[in-house]
Structures are given as structure tokens and as C-alpha cells.
């Protein structure tokens, strides 16, 4: 499957906001957004007039890149959100939050969603006692995510969890730091999700 192999820091600068793609670096002074808070490229510091389509596209790209999805994956989730009852934009964000790679990241078992996908693919985790190695697996309220016993000594998992516990975990997840076991308690409400996302622009973009 295709993957973006370029600089993740350039993506943050392109979207003019922190996407938290580099783990701990994003919380430090080494973050590119702290040092070069402008669009990358030769003419990055020039002011540009953005078209209406450009505004909608940038919002979609920002959300898609935050969760580390490819266009096909993102569009598939959007179509699923359209078929669900309720508000399409909110449904989309909730589906993104339910992805196993995101839940692992929210639980603090990985420093970033990219690292979470790697941990999942390496068969490090159990979901409700069963091994799951599919990052796109959609978690349900009450699902229990645990690090397999033979992997509990991994320093990167312990380090990521320690940092996440210091910053504070979202209200819709809980974790036992000693046992490295977390629970996806509930689907987050819109008010719990990032305020900088304007999902209505994404709906308008795909509706055109």
C-alpha cells in the first residue's frame, strides 16, 4: 500500500497547525512549528489568497493527515459516515476516533498514530483477548486493549504511556498503567474532539 515517506514536519507546516505526527518531538521546542511556522518551500513566507475550494481542501487534508490516512481510506470512512444516522461530519470524526490505531494512541500505548500502527502490525496487542493486527479495526465501547505479556517490557510503550499520563488521557478511555491494559469506554462526543477541526467543510467538499 502507498505511504507518505516525506518529512512529517512539513505536513504540519503545510496545514499551519500541529498534527502531532512525531510523538514527543511535537511537544518540545524542537517542533518545526515552533521554529518555522510558515508553509514549506521557496515561497512559503509569502501571503497567498486561498480560493474557497482551497479552504475546503486544506481542512480535509488536515484531518486526513492528523489521523494518518490515505485518500482512499479516508473516503471509505466518509461514505460509511454518510450512511449512518446523525450528522455526517460528527460521524466521520467519531469513526476516525474508533480506529484501533487511534485508540492505542489515545490510550498512551504509542507516542504517535504511526507508532501505534507499527505496534498493531507487529501483533503486539490483544483486543478483548484476541490478537488483532489491523490498524483500521473499529473499536466499540467496552473494548479492552491489552499489550501481550511477552511485549510488556518494551521501553517505547512504557515511555509513551508515562508521557501520556503526565499530559492526561481523554475522558473516553482509561488505562491500567501497571498491567498495560486500556479500555475504550465510550464514543467521544463532538465537544470532546479537537476544536480546530471543521468537519462541515469536509462534508461540503465531498458534496460538490
Swiss-Prot record:
CDD domains: S4. One of its GO terms (cellular component) is small ribosomal subunit. Residues 98-158 form the S4 RNA-binding domain. HAMAP family: Ribosomal_uS4_B. Belongs to the universal ribosomal protein uS4 family. One of the primary rRNA binding proteins, it binds directly to 16S rRNA where it nucleates assembly of the body of the 30S subunit. With S5 and S12 plays an important role in translational accuracy. NCBIfam families: PRK05327.1, rpsD_bact. This is Small ribosomal subunit protein uS4. The lineage of its organism: Bacteria, Pseudomonadati, Pseudomonadota, Alphaproteobacteria, Magnetococcales.
Amino acid at each position: 500500500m502507498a505511504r507518505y515517506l516525506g518529512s512529517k514536519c512539513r505536513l504540519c507546516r503545510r496545514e499551519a497547525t500541529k498534527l502531532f505526527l512525531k510523538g514527543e518531538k511535537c511537544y518540545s521546542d524542537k517542533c518545526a512549528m515552533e521554529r518555522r511556522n510558515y508553509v514549506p518551500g521557496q515561497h512559503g513566507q509569502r501571503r497567498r489568497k486561498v480560493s474557497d475550494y482551497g479552504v475546503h481542501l486544506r481542512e480535509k487534508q488536515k484531518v486526513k493527515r492528523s489521523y494518518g490516512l490515505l485518500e482512499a481510506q479516508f473516503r471509505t470512512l466518509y461514505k460509511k459516515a454518510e450512511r449512518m444516522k446523525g450528522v455526517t461530519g460528527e460521524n466521520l470524526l467519531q469513526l476516525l476516533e474508533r480506529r484501533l490505531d487511534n485508540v492505542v494512541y489515545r490510550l498512551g500505548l504509542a507516542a504517535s498514530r504511526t507508532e501505534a500502527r507499527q505496534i498493531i502490525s507487529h501483533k503486539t496487542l490483544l483486543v478483548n483477548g484476541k490478537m488483532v493486527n489491523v490498524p483500521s479495526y473499529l473499536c466499540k465501547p467496552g473494548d479492552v486493549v491489552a499489550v501481550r505479556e511477552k511485549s510488556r517490557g518494551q521501553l517505547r510503550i512504557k515511555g509513551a504511556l508515562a508521557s501520556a499520563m503526565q499530559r492526561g488521557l481523554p475522558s473516553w478511555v482509561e488505562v491500567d498503567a501497571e498491567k498495560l491494559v486500556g479500555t475504550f469506554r465510550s464514543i467521544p462526543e463532538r465537544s470532546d474532539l479537537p476544536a480546530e477541526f471543521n468537519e462541515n467543510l469536509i462534508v461540503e467538499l465531498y458534496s460538490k
